[in-house]
Design a protein with these regions (language model features):
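Surface-exposed acidic, glycine/proline-enriched linker/cap segments
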Residues: 272-291
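Electropositive polyanion-binding surfaces
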Residues: 1-277, 296-316
Length: 317
């Protein structure tokens, strides 16, 4: 009994909730929704306000239960909005672009995974994720899958959510911290009051919300990166295993899972060669000596210079 020791009322409520949660998980699997397991950093601070240790956030059953219940609430709200308004607030997630899927397929092959980016395989991505469960580099591979996806956005027309495999989806559960949720609550209230409230300039408002969401996400990541950079100064000169998470004509972005961070390996630090940037294969190809560095490749790097204020780590090969 998972809830032994609780008072009767709480025990019954939690037992019923857990039973419903299990049924929702089965429906999630039946739909083919994506379940990405990506390590999220938790910064453990000391009394002086500096990062003492970086660990991975634990995802408990309680977190999953609440998440599934919130998804159901969001879907119910979206269904009601679609029935009552020609335009409303929807959280859409488009089908992934073919070029990104092609890159994902190539990156997986380099890690011994034969997966072709066909339409059937894209719709059955959960089967691929299931194959990755027992691999030690699971989190890295899941991040590759995430990077191949489109960004979700707020839009007035309902287009569905690819990742969650819902025909209609919106954000309803957090009106105190997300403006789109507040709009959804106002629209739902107008349905209850039988006085439908049509919002002017809705498309512009939702586009603004999507932009600000990206800005807030970027700012949050930058703050975390700056704090992690301070923590990483103690590792300057040390060697770490990483993987190439981005390729540009000027160098490589390398993720270092052990440190929960990303650094830049400038092209000048690579083995001597004349490198060409191949946008399609996302690689730096050496014309003279045949060196090649491709998105998804494993790579050993040294921590070089660190700029805490800029949140940047320079790497050496």
């Amino acid at each position: 009994n998972k809830f032994e020791g609780l008072e009767g009322t709480y025990q019954q409520s939690l037992a019923a909730s857990y039973l419903l949660f299990q049924k929702l998980l089965k429906l999630r699997n039946y739909r083919g929704a994506l379940e990405l397991d990506i390590a999220e950093p938790v910064l453990n601070m000391n009394s002086q306000g500096f990062v003492q240790k970086v660990t991975s956030r634990r995802r408990l059953v309680a977190h999953q239960l609440i998440e599934e219940f919130m998804l159901v609430a969001n879907v119910c709200a979206a269904n009601l909005l679609k029935k009552n308004f020609p335009q409303s607030v929807f959280r859409n997630h488009d089908y992934p672009e073919s070029l990104k899927i092609d890159r994902l397929s190539q990156s997986l092959k380099k890690r011994g995974l034969n997966w072709e980016g066909t339409a059937e395989n894209i719709n059955n991505l959960p089967k691929l994720l299931e194959r990755l469960k027992s691999r030690p580099d699971k989190s890295t591979l899941h991040m590759m899958v995430l990077q191949s996806m489109q960004r979700a956005a707020y839009e007035p027309e309902c287009k569905g959510h690819f990742g969650l495999k819902y025909d209609e989806y919106t954000h309803f559960t957090s009106p105190i911290r997300r403006y789109p949720d507040l709009i959804v609550h106002r629209l739902l209230k107008s349905i209850i009051d039988k006085n439908l409230n049509v919002i002017e300039n809705l498309e512009e408002i939702l586009e603004h919300c999507s932009t600000k969401e990206r800005d807030a996400e970027f700012a949050s990541k930058q703050v975390i990166q700056c704090l992690i950079c301070c923590h990483c100064k103690q590792f300057i000169g040390q060697n770490f295993k990483g993987y190439i998470s981005g390729v540009k004509d000027f160098g490589l972005f390398v993720d270092i899972p052990e440190l929960f961070t990303t650094g830049m390996l400038h092209v000048s630090e690579l083995p001597s060669d004349r490198y060409n940037f191949n946008a399609r294969s996302q690689s730096l190809d050496g014309r003279r000596r045949g060196n090649k560095f491709t998105h998804g490749d494993k790579i050993d790097v040294y921590i070089g210079e660190i700029s805490e204020l800029e949140g940047k780590i320079s790497l050496y090969y």
